[in-house]
Swiss-Prot record:
Gene3D superfamilies with a match to the protein in the record: 1.20.5.190
Regions crossing the membrane: none
Residue ranges, annotated region (Disordered): 1-98, 300-401, 434-480
A GO molecular-function descriptor: calmodulin binding
Domain of life assignment: Eukaryota
A Pfam family it matches: IQ
Residues of the IQ domain: 120-148, 149-171
Short motif (Nuclear localization signal 1): ranges: 2-9
UniProt main location, coarse: nucleus
Gene that this polypeptide is encoded by: IQD18
Bias (Basic and acidic residues) ranges: 377-388
Protein name, UniProt field: Protein IQ-DOMAIN 18
Motif Nuclear localization signal 2 boundaries: 22-29
Self-association state and partner proteins as the record states: Binds to multiple calmodulin (CaM) in the presence of Ca(2+) and CaM-like proteins.
Length: 527
């Protein structure tokens, strides 16, 4: 019976270990154990003295099994003191009849507690092992997934890098293949050109050789036809004759080739010489053609006509003395700011002044020459011969000066003034002394050159304006500018104004020679 109970208790312990520990199961197990015990008591009834050892014997065997089950499990603090509290009184000096019931009651109370705690510990161990196994499996799965993912990513990156390297290598291979093909093509083309040139040269040489061979063969045939001897000859004699003919043909070919080469060289040299001669002829013909073209140019006629027109225009040369300053006294002398008259007006006033009687001034006068600034007008020796001097000397006490005007024109001013004097009134007619003075001044004076005169001759002004026509000298009152209002009263005031203007011009410009570019300003000032 003890074995059965032990086996049943072991099976129940195993079953309880695999079941989830709950309070209901624990209470049910306790109730089942009590019911089994009751059934056993019903079937096996014994006296009380015998039942106690049976009970003790029935209860005592499972104790070591439970202890063997709980070897690994730590004993709880409640069980240890229970053993300590229960065992000492059993060893006390009492009769065995009193000890047995106490042991049975203690065993009855301690057995369910031990079983309960053993089941709990076993269940906790199982739960922990299962949970730890679950965690380990989950970590393993996660690790496997991570490893797979890393392997995939790394494999993708590696494949991508490998593809890029392969593409780069393919591109390099393509470029190298193209370069090699191009080099091969160029070398092939060069070889073809060289081969073509060589073949062309060989063809030309062969062609020349064929021609020479044909010529030699024809000559040999002609010579053979002419010189061939029908008489029988030995083989040695025939060989000698053939060798001789071949030698002559070779010499003839060599001479022909040398002649052809010399002719070719002569042609090239002749062509070069003819080209050089042609270039020399062209260089010699160019200036001739240029001269002919310049001789027939269209603007030459216009230039010649312009020169002839310029030669026709006469230019008045006025000589003004600047070596000696002019003296101005009295209130009748005009101011510098007044505007001088035009060239035509000056000529008119010179004509009107010529009608007054005047005496020569003792003061020495030196002429200042106002020459032409235009390079177009050239001197004519006939005009130099036909020069006429016109001088006017004032006898007024306030102004003593002597002007000398030289006009390069076909007719002199003095003759025109003398001829026009008859048209003037009697009170304006010139006297005999004035006419004699004019005649005496008409011839040019020959003065010896001195250093003072040479130095004074350097200080000159250049002006050019055309000589007015002779009709202007005939009218005395009509040729006046409308802007010239200051001399409308009398000729004497005009004379003073003009003389003062000339003196101011000379005093302001002492030591200055006006260039042709600056003559326009002086013309504007004289207007």
């Amino acid at each position: 019976m003890g074995k059965k109970n032990g086996s049943s208790s072991w099976l129940t312990a195993v079953k309880r270990a695999f079941r989830s520990p709950t309070k209901k199961d624990h209470s049910n197990d306790v109730e089942e154990d009590e019911e089994k015990k009751r059934e056993k008591r019903r079937w096996f009834r014994k006296p009380a003295t015998q039942e106690s050892p049976v009970k003790s014997s029935g209860i005592s065997p499972p104790a070591p099994q439970e202890d063997s089950l709980n070897v690994n499990s730590k004993p709880s603090p409640e069980t240890a003191p229970s053993y300590a509290t229960t065992t000492p009184p059993s060893n006390a000096g009492k009769p065995p009849s009193a000890v047995v019931p106490i042991a049975t009651s203690a065993s009855k109370t301690l057995a369910p507690r031990r079983i309960y705690y053993a089941r709990e510990n076993y269940a906790a161990v199982v739960i922990q092992t299962s949970f730890r196994g679950y965690l380990a499996r989950r970590a393993l799965r996660a690790l496997k997934g991570l490893v797979k993912l890393q392997a995939l990513v790394r494999g993708h990156n590696v494949r991508k890098q490998a593809k890029m390297t392969l593409r780069c290598m393919q591109a390099l291979v393509r470029v190298q293949s193209r370069v090699l093909d191009q080099r091969k093509r160029l070398s092939h083309d060069g070889s073809r050109k060289s081969a073509f040139s060589d073949s062309h040269a060989v063809f030309e040489s062969r062609y020349l050789q064929d021609l020479s061979d044909r010529q030699s063969m024809s000559r040999e045939g002609s010579s053979a036809a002419e010189d061939w001897d029908d008489r029988p000859h030995t083989i040695d004699a025939v060989k000698v004759m053939l060798q001789r003919r071949r030698d002559t043909a070779l010499r003839h070919d060599k001479t022909n080739l040398s002649q052809a080469f010399s002719q070719k060289m002569w042609r090239t040299v002749g062509n070069q010489s003819t080209e050089g001669h042609h270039e020399v002829e062209l260089e010699e013909e160019r200036p001739k053609w240029l001269d002919r073209w310049m001789a027939t140019r269209p603007w030459d006629k216009r230039a010649s006509s312009r020169a002839s027109v310029d030669q026709r225009v006469s230019v008045k040369t006025v000589e003004i003395d600047t070596s000696q300053p002019y003296s101005r006294t009295g209130a009748g002398s005009p101011s510098r700011g007044q505007r001088p008259s035009s060239p035509s007006r000056t000529s008119h006033h010179y004509q009107s002044r010529n009608n007054f009687s005047a005496t020569p001034s003792p003061a020495k006068s030196r002429p200042i020459l106002i020459r032409s600034a235009s390079p177009r007008c050239q001197r004519d020796p006939r005009e130099d011969r036909d020069r006429a001097a016109y001088s006017y000397t004032s006898n007024t006490p306030s102004l003593r000066s002597n002007y000398s005007f030289t006009a390069r024109s076909g007719c002199s001013i003095s003759t025109t003034m003398v001829n026009n004097a008859s048209l003037l009134p009697n009170y304006m007619a010139s006297t005999e002394s004035a006419k004699a003075r004019i005649r005496s001044h008409s011839a040019p004076r020959q003065r010896p050159s001195t250093p003072e005169r040479d130095r004074a001759g350097l200080v000159k002004k250049r002006l050019s304006y055309p000589v007015p026509p002779p009709a202007e000298y005939e009218d005395n009152n009509s040729l006046r500018s409308p802007s010239f209002k200051s001399v409308a009263g009398s000729h004497f005031g005009g004379m003073l104004e003009q003389q003062s203007n000339y003196s101011s011009c000379c005093t302001e410009s002492n030591g200055v020679e006006i260039s042709p570019a600056s003559t326009s300003d002086f013309r504007n000032w004289l207007r």
